[in-house]
Amino acid sequence: MISNDVLLNTFSLLMIFFLLLWGGCFFIFTYKELDGPKLGKESFLYFNFIFFKRGILSNISLLTLFCGYLSAALVEYRREFNYLMLIVNMMGGIAFLLYGIYGKCFFHGVSEINKPLFFIRVFIAEVDFSFGSLLLWLSRLMYMTWIVMFVINS
């Protein structure tokens, strides 16, 4: 279906642009950092790379994930005009960003970046009460709120 809504089309193009850029970063990561595909582990290792590695490629990947998610939230808002879902989807995007900032700047544990699902284990099991872990706790709270509200409104 073709839409005449200029903002919807603009946000859709932005979303496609950011997702293509994010996919390009994944391609570069797979062939530059991993030296080729690793039989299904590269997507998990890519998220470890995004959330815990410091560098230009990982920062660009995190920002394109965040911007792509926010533009997708704006596309959904322009389709349904539901303010609650806009706020909840924005919280989900901010949760990704806060977790990335925590992992890059404030995570002080042993970084097992080459193990798949490391980013999930840190998100679920890391218990820390330092100032930097405030970002982790806010990310958890926003992510859980996002899941609950997404399930309620579906």
Positions of predicted regions on the chain:
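Short membrane-interface loop/juxtamembrane segments of multi-pass integral membrane proteins
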Residues: 40-52, 114-132
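Final/C-terminal transmembrane alpha-helix of multipass membrane proteins
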Residues: 128-154
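Short, strongly hydrophobic alpha-helical membrane anchors
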Residues: 1-8
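Juxtamembrane "helix-exit" motif on the non-cytosolic side of transmembrane helices
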Residues: 33, 68-80, 150-154
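Short alpha-helical packing/oligomerization segments
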Residues: 76-113
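Interfacial helix-start motif at the membrane-water boundary
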Residues: 47-64
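N-terminal signal-anchor/start-transfer transmembrane helix
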Residues: 9-37
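Alpha-helical transmembrane segments of polytopic membrane proteins
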Residues: 10-17, 54-56, 84-95
